[in-house]
A protein has these predicted regions:
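N-terminal targeting signals for export/organelle localization
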Residues: 1-46
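Short, surface-exposed amphipathic charged segments that create phosphate/polyanion-binding patches used
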Residues: 138-146, 161-164
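Structural micro-motif
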Residues: 122-124, 142-157
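Short active-site neighborhood of thiol/selenol oxidoreductases, capturing the structured segment around
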Residues: 50-79, 94-95
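Thiol-/selenol-based redox modules, centered on thioredoxin-like
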Residues: 150-194
Length: 194
């Protein structure tokens, strides 16, 4: 009798655990569309000459422009918080607009990610872009944010398979976070200037 009970528990319990986790919510589907039909990519090849498109992909879109000096920490954070979690999906990708003159800096950043954390960069795309292309595409998102003088922003954006910008539009902490970020930047500028 004990053997049958133990065997029953060993078979039924994993099945119940699987059913519990399989019924989990897909939070991405609940994100509202903030901007429908954003502009498609003005460039269809990355620095490594690989084809890239937003259509039919779930994309994390970043605008790093000519400001790559301090992006290693952001890249590592994005890798840990987002990429490692969703890397198994074939249609998931990171796409970054980068100044077309920054190929060496992009390669150094990629090397740091690969050697430091062993990141698989097959779904990371760095697009060589002109400032005009970066600005034009960023404006198609219609967000309240601005690019800095280097055509860069610390924010990343979620774009769905149909080129819709997704995200939260009721974030109570957004203004507070923006003010805090601006204060941090101002402190950094003051420390560099003095």
């Amino acid at each position: 009798m004990k053997k049958q009970l133990v065997l029953g528990v060993l078979f039924v319990f994993p099945l119940l655990v699987y059913l519990f986790f399989a019924s989990g919510k897909n939070n991405f589907a609940k994100l509202p569309t903030l901007t429908p039909n954003i502009q498609s990519l003005p460039i269809n090849k990355d620095f490594s000459n690989r084809s890239v498109t937003l259509k039919d992909h779930i994309s994390i879109l970043g605008y790093w422009g000519g400001d790559l000096s301090d992006k290693k920490a952001e890249a590592l954070n994005l890798n840990e918080k987002i990429f490692k979690r969703f890397n198994g999906f074939d249609d998931f990708q990171f796409v970054f607009f980068v100044n077309e003159e920054n190929e060496e800096e992009v390669q150094a950043l990629k090397n740091a990610l690969q050697t430091g954390t062993g990141t698989d960069l097959s779904n990371w795309y760095f697009l060589p872009s002109s400032p005009k292309q970066i600005q034009s595409h960023f404006q198609s998102l219609k967000t309240p944010y601005q690019l800095n003088q280097q055509y860069s922003t610390p924010y990343v954006f979620i774009v769905d398979k149909n080129l819709n910008l997704r995200g939260r539009n009721d974030d109570e902490d957004m203004e507070e976070a923006k003010l805090l970020w601006e204060k941090q930047i101002e402190k950094l500028r003051q420390s560099i200037g003095s």
